[in-house]
Each structure stands twice: as structure tokens, then as C-alpha cells.
Amino acid sequence: MKLIIVSGRSGSGKSTALHVLEDLGFYCIDNLPIGLLFPLTREAATQEAPGRLKKMAVSIDARNLSAELANFETIYQQLKQTGVELEIIFLDADEQSLLQRFHATRRKHPLSDDKTSLREAITNEKQLLEPLSKLADLYVNTTGLSMYELRDMIKQRVAGRKDQELALLFQSFGFKHGVPVDSDYVFDVRCLPNPYWDTSLRKHTGVDQPVIDFLEREPLTRQMVDDLTGFLNTWLPSFADSNRSYMTISIGCTGGQHRSVYVCEQLGRYFRDNYRNVQVRHTELPHLQARGEI
């Protein structure tokens, strides 16, 4: 049987992720106590009609006892020894985003009380869930994602991946906005010529032909793309051979509008020839569009 554990801090999008998995045919259980993981998998294995419980997804959060959370790695290893195909999806967002989401919904944080502020509860929750986050197969940073964008990302990364197949996400970002925390690899392409300084290109992005033409006139651009594809061609198979399910490769330039977008598009196009589940995401473009800058 396949078991996906969904975890993450409150407000990060666990319920949305679980709903997506339910739509994908998983039998879903919300807020399962860790102590019930073994009984659940045993029950699923003894079902006379096992098809219904062949794919299961459960969410685990900080409402579990702290001792059980601290002991999660032992339980995780024991579950894997039983032959369960186990995968962990961990969702998180930056502290400011979590604060804003709680203020917007006016929900009470499960760890807050008369002596613990919302900010303190969010910080404490991160520490409690560290045993799960460090074992995550897929770490999703939901900062800046709408509910619909999160649904699409989970659906594409989980549903589009065949068993034992490596799923790739190439994402562009701007260093001035911070490095995405869900990155497995981070590459800096700020050494490439910057189209921003050509005033005719400031409203364009790395997917627009004028910017593509500008960058491809420079031999350094082709060399950068070739070197990155060569490096990833060498090492991605090793990650796949070690049963890695997901890889997030982040490409950064100054603002996340021109150079990083172009390089991500080139890498995505190249690796789609060898990997069936390849996504390209441009983290800054929706924000630039919302501000009328592109």
C-alpha cells in the first residue's frame, strides 16, 4: 500500500493538500494521532477488499503529543520496514504569511493560549514538527501561493509522477526577495548580462522573445545553460537511484524577471525529454504582474 503523510505548520495549506489527494483517489484521514499509524496500516493490510485502502493519505500536526513527535523518526523507519510505500509532504510558509492567514480567518492557533501569543505558537510549532520536516520527500513553500496555485502544484507533482520516478521543479526567483526555502539546489545567474538596463526590455520577462534574443546574443548565456544541464545530467540520476522522489532546482537573478526566468525555461524544455514530470514555476512574475510592472 501507498501512504502519504501530509504535515506542516497550521495555516500552511495542509487541508488543501489533503483535499487534492482525496480527489486523486486517496483515502484521507485528517489529524491522525501518530500512535495510530501502525494500527491503520495493519487494518489496511487485512482488508478483504484492499483496493479502497491501497492508497491512503493522513495529515499529522502539532496537536500530537510532543513525545510522539520527537519519536517520529523511529516510527517512520519501522513503517518502512513493513513494506509500506511511504512518502512525506511537508508544507510551510514564512512567519509573516502565517500570521496574516490567521488574522484573515480569525482562527485560533492550536498551540496558542492565554500565555502563548500567536507568533510564539507559530515558532513553537516549527520546532515540534522538525522530526517530520527533516524527513520530507517533498517540501512545499506556500508563501505567496493562492489556494488554487497550491492545489495545482500538489496535483501536478503527485499525480504526474509515476512510482519510483523523479519529479523535477525548476523555479526562478529574485535574490532581493530571498532564496526559496524549499530548494534542493540553488544556482545564481546574476553574472549574465542584465536585460533590465535596456529600458525597452524592462516591461518584458524571460519568456518574451525580445529578452530571449538579448540573452542569446551573449555566448556566456549558452555556456551557463550548457554547464547547468551537464551538471544536472550527471547528478540527477544518482538522486533517482537513491529513491529520491522530488527535486527542486531554484535559479536566481536580482529580481526574478529576466535571466532566471529564461534559464528555468531552457532547463525545463531540455529535461522534459528525459523526465516525465517536469514543472517550471516563476515565483516573482505573478507579483510583478499584480503591481503592473510587466
UniProtKB/Swiss-Prot annotation:
GO terms for molecular function: ATP binding; GTP binding. ATP binds at G8, R9, S10, G11, S12, G13, K14, S15. It holds the Pfam family PapZ_C. Keywords: ATP-binding, GTP-binding, Nucleotide-binding. Coiled coil: none annotated. GTP binds at D61, A62, R63, N64. It comes from the Bacteria. The keyword Transcription regulation does not apply. PANTHER family: RNASE ADAPTER PROTEIN RAPZ (PTHR30448:SF0). Belongs to the RapZ-like family. NCBIfam families: PRK05416.1 (NF003828). Displays ATPase and GTPase activities. This is Nucleotide-binding protein Maqu_2718. It comes from Marinobacter nauticus (strain ATCC 700491 / DSM 11845 / VT8).
